[in-house]
């Protein structure tokens, strides 16, 4: 049994090959770019401001998210660990791209 469900709010766009597992909430109108992997323990780092803001288990509303990595030190050395990066906020141009995908699905057109 899942301790905490996956919650995907309204008008979220999920790109190809994304993985979202238990304990993650994706808030309304967020955009997950291709290959984003989110677990309850995945660092979600907002890099849009002067200083990074770190989230775990939640993608804020209207965030545009892509896969990324950060450096973590281990006994054997420094290695890159996967994370998700918030690189911006959903804009009108993003809405147009996602509405095109909706239209293609509605009319069963493969692209």
Regions from the PLM with identified roles:
Residues 1-73:
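Structural signal for interior beta-strand "rungs" in well-ordered beta-sheet cores
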Residues 56, 61-63, 67-111:
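Terminal amphipathic alpha-helical/low-complexity segments used for targeting or macromolecular assembly
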């Amino acid at each position: 049994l899942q301790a905490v469900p996956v919650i995907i709010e309204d008008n979220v766009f999920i790109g190809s090959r994304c993985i979202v597992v238990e304990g993650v909430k994706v808030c309304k109108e967020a955009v997950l770019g291709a290959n984003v992997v989110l677990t309850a323990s995945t660092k979600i780092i907002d890099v849009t401001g002067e200083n990074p803001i770190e989230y775990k288990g939640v993608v804020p509303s209207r965030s545009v998210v892509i896969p990324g990595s950060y450096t973590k030190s281990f006994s054997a050395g420094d290695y890159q660990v996967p994370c998700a990066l918030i690189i911006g906020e959903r804009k009108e141009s993003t809405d147009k791209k996602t509405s095109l995908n909706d239209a293609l699905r509605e009319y069963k057109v493969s692209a």
